[in-house]
Amino acid sequence: MAERATHRDRLRALEFEAFVAGAGGRLLHTATLLTGEPSHPPGAYARAERLLHAALARTYADWDGPHGGDPYDLARRELALRFAREGRRHQRPRGGPLDRLTPVERLVLVLRVYEEVGEERTAALLGLPGDRVRAVCARAVAALRAPRRDAGPGRASSHGRAGQRAARGPGAAP
């Protein structure tokens, strides 16, 4: 009996290792998008790795193998929920396009755009109404499309031409 349980545990571990070998890279990229850390050079994304390891540990604890549903969905769900719980503790990302977004906006945008999770599934996953997910996603996309406010000379400014004229002063030549 104990031999059968040991064999089952080894099989479970091998199935999980195969899953991580196949999906680990994409899940790590998702974690780096959520934390806003750069994905290069390797080792520059310590928070994303910690987030992924914690999510994978929980996934392994709930692991039923490929027969218990989609293991990628299970891991992605755990990654998203763990980030949502810890989102306030994550530092704001520095220097990337997602640094202007709140943790909730990053989470919704990553799930909807990068992971291509439907609006209803995203809402169910996060425990939010569908309208709220739609509004958060639209706000995040608008924030990414808007020119940066901290743009220096030669870069776009969020104030546009009117802001440039105002900075030069009234009556100044364009």
Spell out what each predicted region is:
Residues 1-35, 46:
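A short, charge-rich alpha-helical start-of-domain segment used by transcription regulators
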Residues 24, 28-32, 45, 49-89, ...:
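Σ70-family region 2.3-2.4 aromatic/basic alpha-helix that recognizes the −10 promoter
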Residues 24, 41, 115-116:
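Flexible coil/turn residues that form the inter-helical turn or adjacent wing/linker of helix-turn-helix
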Residues 126-163, 171-173:
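DNA-recognition helix of helix-turn-helix
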Residues 24, 28, 98, 105-106, ...:
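C-terminal flanking helix
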Residues 90-101, 124, 129, 144:
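Short amphipathic alpha-helical boundary/capping segments
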Residues 48, 122, 133-134:
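Helix-turn-helix DNA-binding helix
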Residues 100-121:
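Short amphipathic alpha helix immediately N-terminal
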